[in-house]
């Protein structure tokens, strides 16, 4: 096989380990990639910060494009198809990471605001890899779960199979937590650009919480800011923002939890994404797969990710919050983003990108182990199915 030139986003982990068998790997910041950079490459590996289309690719010799992301709204797939360039992405690679984030965020909100998650109904808008897993985990934490996914509901109706999905109006009328897990689509039968607008927010029930970990433009930031200032949305959690990498500082200050687009940034999910692109390139080129991502994410020792059971005298919410934060505490990422509020737009954009590029090596909750004998019986399902931690 001819040696290939591989251009990769600098923030894709283990890319040299995985793709080195195919040729030379060059890494650079995804936001800085230009046509002249791509012109020297046979393989292009990107993340969501690199728009992939004719403006970047026209006249280049690419043989393969991969995006280490779940979403593909930054990729002109019709253009790639017309050019005969194979494309792969990584659906589901960071689904557990995003679910970890939502679980941790909800436990934190419940702890700060009083009350238990078991007393709340959650509406999950978008039930693909992330939303589907999250539905199971939040159910295990005692929440009533409503699922909304029009494309999947239509497909199930066409097949004559049951699905259990409900209309968005039902979610907005009955749920006091709404969490968004949809792709960004500007047109078509189910557009999601500014899905959460003033009308959506007006239909939310009193005391509702809103979480967005999908794409920033799914939420109209101005509408959410106005609603928060009126007190119409009781709590808001945003990991994604319009105008990234320079989000509106007023909106950062207005929400309860603000993080720099890192919900899916657990190291396990990142490496899983690299592995999925690697396997896709092997298939495209007929090469033998010699690298496995599982070797890269194995803990250094059996005790490396061992947690400790919290004080059994704590309330259920406090107990589960204290255990979850041993694996991941989103308040740490919230503090780092709030430090950017006083910066100007350009400096804020650079700092936002730096937070993502230099993100710590967080591990998924399912990689963590807790002594089984120290877990009270009433928490066992919450630990193993809600937090996805292992008992030993």
Curated annotation (Swiss-Prot):
As for what it does, the entry says: Catalyzes the oxidation of erythronate-4-phosphate to 3-hydroxy-2-oxo-4-phosphonooxybutanoate.
Any GO BP: 'de novo' pyridoxal 5'-phosphate biosynthetic process
Gene Ontology terms: cellular component: cytosol
Q: State its Enzyme Commission number(s).
A: 1.1.1.290
Question: Assembly and interactions?
Answer: Homodimer.
Citing just one GO molecular function, the answer is: 4-phosphoerythronate dehydrogenase activity
The taxonomic lineage of its organism, from the top, reads: Bacteria, Pseudomonadati, Rhodothermota, Rhodothermia, Rhodothermales
Give the protein's recorded name: Erythronate-4-phosphate dehydrogenase
Q: Which UniProt keywords apply?
A: Cytoplasm, NAD, Oxidoreductase, Pyridoxine biosynthesis
Main subcellular location of this protein, as a coarse class: cytoplasm
Which compartment or compartments is the protein found in? Answer: Cytoplasm
Recorded catalytic reaction(s): these are: 4-phospho-D-erythronate + NAD(+) = (R)-3-hydroxy-2-oxo-4-phosphooxybutanoate + NADH + H(+)
By sequence similarity, the record places it as follows: Belongs to the D-isomer specific 2-hydroxyacid dehydrogenase family. PdxB subfamily.
Q: Which Pfam families match?
A: 2-Hacid_dh, 2-Hacid_dh_C
Q: Which InterPro entries match?
A: D-isomer_2_OHA_DH_cat_dom, D-isomer_DH_NAD-bd, Erythronate-4-P_DHase, NAD(P)-bd_dom_sf, PdxB_dimer_sf
